[in-house]
């Protein structure tokens, strides 16, 4: 009985406090930048709010503490975490702070800064790894070191957080993290970290992005660098089906 009620959305998993309580997903065609799907959960039936509004249904949405009218794909900003490491690897390789063949030993605990952050695998270690292996294994220690090198000019000067963040900001901007994506609905502005570059190098510090912003970035990685300005529209037609306007993602 209960499964059938949930299947028919008479009762939602969110109302029963079943995980996941909230989530979002954005799917794109990386070759063209087309947004194929943009989903926020929990959601609602828009048909019941079109033309004649179902007042009781609308009131239930307003009172629902799981916030079904809140678009988690475009409005919820969170730290990108390890997904951000591709930005850092690109910056490190391009600016010469790391090289493809260089191997860095993961010592578990990074002692070059005062809070001594640890790799996720600590007290174990990834051993000596290069940049591709560090991305594969999501080695925090490797990227702590990369962020530290950016902040010291490859150990040529004392630690300077502004120096490190400026490098990361430059490359984050190249991947489109300095602007919204172009979609035609409400979207929170992204925030590129402006402090703690060693932590920013693993997608922490005060980095904050929405799911759709992360999708645009990953799309650019997958297609070798094209950052698209997204659209949720395909075309506008009149009542007779004549196409009045078409929309395409722009680079």
Question: Model-derived features: where do they sit?
Answer:
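Beta-lactam-recognizing serine transpeptidase/beta-lactamase-like catalytic domain environment
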Residues: 2, 6, 13, 17-82, ...
């Amino acid at each position: 009985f209960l499964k059938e009620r949930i299947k028919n959305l008479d009762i939602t998993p969110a109302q029963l406090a079943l995980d996941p309580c909230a989530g979002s997903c954005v799917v794109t065609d990386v070759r063209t930048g087309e947004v194929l799907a943009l989903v926020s959960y929990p959601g609602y039936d828009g048909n019941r709010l079109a033309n004649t509004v179902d007042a009781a249904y609308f009131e239930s949405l307003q009172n629902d503490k799981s916030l079904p009218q809140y678009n988690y794909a475009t409005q919820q900003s969170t730290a990108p975490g390890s997904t951000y490491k591709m930005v850092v690897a690109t910056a490190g390789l391009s600016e010469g702070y790391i090289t493809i063949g260089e191997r860095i030993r993961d010592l578990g605990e990074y002692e070059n800064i005062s809070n001594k952050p640890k790799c996720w695998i600590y007290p174990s270690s990834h051993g000596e790894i290069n940049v591709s292996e560090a991305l594969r294994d999501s080695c925090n220690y490797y990227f702590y070191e990369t962020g530290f090198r950016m902040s010291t000019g490859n150990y040529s000067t004392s630690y300077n957080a502004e120096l490190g963040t400026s490098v990361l900001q430059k490359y984050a901007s190249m991947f489109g993290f300095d602007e919204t994506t172009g979609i035609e609905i409400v979207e929170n502005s992204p925030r590129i970290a402006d402090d703690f570059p060693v932590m920013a190098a693993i997608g922490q510090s005060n980095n904050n992005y929405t799911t759709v912003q992360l999708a645009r970035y990953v799309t650019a990685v997958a297609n070798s660098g094209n950052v698209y300005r997204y659209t949720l529209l395909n075309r506008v037609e009149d009542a007779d089906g004549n196409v009045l306007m078409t929309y395409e993602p722009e680079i």
